[in-house]
Amino acid sequence: MELVLKDAQSALTVSETTFGRDFNEALVHQVVVAYAAGARQGSRGQKTRAEVTGSGKKPWRQKGTGRARSGSVKSPIWRSGGVTFAAKPQDHSQKVNKKMYRGALKSILSELVRQDRLIVVEQFSVKAPKTKLLAQKLKDMALEDVLIITGELDENLFLAARNLYKVDVRDANGIDPVSLIAFDKVVMTADAVKQVEEMLA
């Protein structure tokens, strides 16, 4: 299959298996959920009644005071006592096979092509690391919410995009399923397309 280059009167021949496969919603969902789960810090921690500081002495005798019976100041019922089901640090990451991950990326890229959300250009750059230059370039292309993927990370482009809302710049090795679906449009250079194709082959 061929992808038309927007800034040139030509087309780029690409693999049908990478940019023309059927959309596997279940696979994409599983990989996106796993990716988001892996980003969780999982460092929360609370103390149980066994871990909080406090005396082990019974606060008052069992009977005869008229008060409710009590055996410990560390009881979860008491103020400054332990937490009943205390949260502990945990690893939320989910295992995703390479084949599944690559399949999800191919599925997303193919769907972007079908929805006309993938724009392929010969090259994409700015002369200087100026936000104004990139903002004007995107305005000329009628792009607002956009992910720009280049073959090599262009420092000028990266610095120019840092202060733009809903604009991100990545190199081909930095793509992930969440960022590909998070933006309205994805702009890829011809070099990036070839690199992604080789990476997912």
Curated annotation (Swiss-Prot):
UniProt region (Disordered), positions on chain: 43-73
HAMAP family: Ribosomal_uL4_B
Record's protein name: Large ribosomal subunit protein uL4
Species in which this protein is naturally found: Sodalis glossinidius (strain morsitans)
RNA-binding keyword on record: yes
Keyword entries, A-Z: Ribonucleoprotein, Ribosomal protein, RNA-binding, rRNA-binding
InterPro entries: Ribosomal_uL4 (IPR002136), Ribosomal_uL4-like (IPR013005), Ribosomal_uL4_dom_sf (IPR023574)
UniProt GO BP: translation
Molecular function as annotated in GO: rRNA binding; structural constituent of ribosome
GO cellular component term, pick one: ribonucleoprotein complex
Self-association and partners: Part of the 50S ribosomal subunit.
